[in-house]
Amino acid sequence: MTSITHDQRPSKLVPPHGSAELKPLLLNGEARNQALKLASTLPAITLSSRERGDLIMFGIGGFTPLNGFMNQADWQGVVDNMRLQSGDNAGLFWPIPITLSAPKATADSLNQGDKVALVAQDGEIMGILTVEETYTIDKEHECQQVFTTTDPEHPGVQQVLEQGEVNIAGSVEVLSEGEFPTLYPEIYKTPAETRAILDNKGWQTVAAFQTRNPMHRSHEYLAKIAIEICDGVLIHSLLGALKPGDIPADVRQEAIKTLIDNYFRADTVIQAGYPLDMRYAGPREALLHAVFRQNYGCSHLIVGRDHAGVGDYYGAFDAQTIFDHVGKDDLITQPLKIGWTFWCNACNAMASDKTCPHEASEHVKVSGTKLRKALSEDLDVPENFSRPEVLQILRDYYAGIAFDERAEVKLVGASAV
């Protein structure tokens, strides 16, 4: 099925994952008003920050073709084999479980077919879930399979270990996109809105650049490599929760906009954002990034060093090699794999391990962690780390934080090289 844009030109973009069309679950108008009235009378489950972001992605169609939080069969299939196991989506590739949890006492009070309100931690009613089943899981097994570790210091593992004792499965109706549309009006875009922008540009091949950091020179280099290959690049910023020490989304938005305005052709790049929290699942999260970027209309995902990683839990390029084990029939969006990138003093330019003939002593390897560490400790930042306009924005941000209130930034794993 070929989708049609508002001006009736057929779309050249990749189709959504596992579906001919997007499947947003967000209610609007009178249907939303009636659902809100109903929700106010229902028992409630309070969402974690991660679950809230997942629910919003259901709402906007970012998790097409899923219709709600996974049941036990799907949880097991995804954790062990990265495949859904039930319903119309049985056999579909999906790399990370999308689940809702609750305390045992809450779960024990629920029966199949019951409706429960899904409420954010600030009290906002976010949605309604119709209970399919409740089930317990082996949390350590999920962590080992998804994160390759059960270390409670890993932020993603910590989220799983701290979630409720019982998972609640069921279809959802989404009633709110939270603060994202008003807090980030310039860059927060639904998959349908993003596809409309890409279609209006006439793009067919689009590379997504996933970022949770302001863009330094290596990021800029990766994006420009992708522009040479594809019609354009979607710089797609995570707008949900991060770990302590990461730079807030509003600062990143300003820094990225400044970089685009000064160093990119305007007709080759789009800045946008999406509402998820980071899971820091490394290779598995890279696959999830590809799945939902397909829903946003992207044919490719830029996968560089330590994509979606944290600390030293993953090898520098594990997030690239995992794609080698995924069939092309399972995932249309393909990785653009790019190796080590760095500033070379001898080349006097950005380069990569494929293009530069010079010794490692000439290379300045740039990472977001190194940049954050230098800025948070008021150290000098080499001029080849980041563009001066971007650096000024970041310095202004750190100047507003008392030195003893800044989170410690540690160099470990690939970021320490």
Swiss-Prot record:
Broad EC category: transferase
InterPro entries (UniProt xref): ATP-Sase_PUA-like_dom, PUA-like_sf, Rossmann-like_a/b/a_fold, SO4_adenylyltransferase_pro, Sulfurylase_cat_dom, Sulphate_adenylyltransferase
Keywords, alphabetical: ATP-binding, Nucleotide-binding, Nucleotidyltransferase, Transferase
EC number: 2.7.7.4
CDD domains xref list: ATPS
Molecular functions (GO terms): ATP binding; sulfate adenylyltransferase (ATP) activity
Substrates-to-products reaction catalysed: sulfate + ATP + H(+) = adenosine 5'-phosphosulfate + diphosphate
HAMAP family per the UniProt record, alphabetical: Sulf_adenylyltr
Name this protein carries in UniProt: Sulfate adenylyltransferase
Higher taxonomy: Bacteria, Pseudomonadati, Pseudomonadota, Gammaproteobacteria, Moraxellales
